[in-house]
Amino acid sequence: MEKTGQNHADIILDTWIPMDSAGHSSKGNQWKWRREDRWYKVDHMGYEGLAETVVSRLMAFADGVSYVSYEPVRMEYKGKIYNGCSSRNFLQEDEELVTVEHLFRQYTGKSLSAEVGKINGVKERILYLSGRIEENTGLKGFGIYLQKILAVDAFFLNEDRHTNNLAVIYRLWEKRYRFSPLFDHGLSLLSDTETDFPLGKPLEECLAEVEAKPFSRDFDEQLDAAEELYGCNVKFRFGKKEVENVLEECGIYYSKETVERVREILYGQMRKYRHMMDGKG
């Protein structure tokens, strides 16, 4: 999308009614709009739009990972300008997105997150969730799919992967399920500058405080358990050059301080997770 300048919007949404994302984020509601075949989301806690676009651009360098592509966008609504992101609707006609929380409640009448929380051991929790979802949907290989999600979330520090943010797609006309592409990475890369990770806070403190979901508060504990069960199924083929290109494209509406923080996080994660880097990290 062609950008029109720092103080101008790419799209005006005055004639469209916003929806909120209640229940789909652990940090409050985020305005979003559906316009024709695209979704638009405004930044709510900080730089979620930047996080969404950076993560999706870098996932283009990962083999075997289906993902939703986001792009940065500046929106005008009722005279105010908002940063955010836009994505194409990934559901086909007569398809619906079903969260694993909703699916589990539908079959058992119980809360999946509560049942998982009763289980001792991260590996056991992962096995329980993947087993129940395979049983309820008929999908095979949900554990490998889940490992990919946990790997991407660990690498990009996604703190919002609760059971209402894990989903499958139901095909109404075929009465069967399919895997959903990876989506919703807005609360990644320490994007919550409003409450938990203000830009003036030392990065080391932020990294020590950020917490994972849904099996453990520790990203590495989740990832290690999933890799022991299903192996490492994500390999990134990007290096610093690709990161710089992505930041130049996606960071156009954000401060230099914000972009520099994201750069520092990414370089640190590339060093930390060398086993996920295919020779360039």
Stretch-by-stretch model annotation:
Residues 68-78, 162-172, 279-281:
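Short alpha-helical "patches" and their helix-cap loops
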Residues 64-66, 140, 186, 253:
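Short coil/loop linkers at secondary-structure junctions
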Residues 64-66, 160, 276:
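Short helix-capping/linker segments at secondary-structure and domain boundaries
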Residues 90-150, 249, 253-261, 265, ...:
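ATP-dependent phospho-/nucleotidyl transfer catalytic cores
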Residues 43-44, 172-281:
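C-terminal catalytic region of ATP-dependent kinase domains
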Residues 125-191:
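Conserved kinase catalytic-core segment
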Residues 1-112:
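Conserved ATP-binding subdomain of kinase catalytic cores across diverse folds
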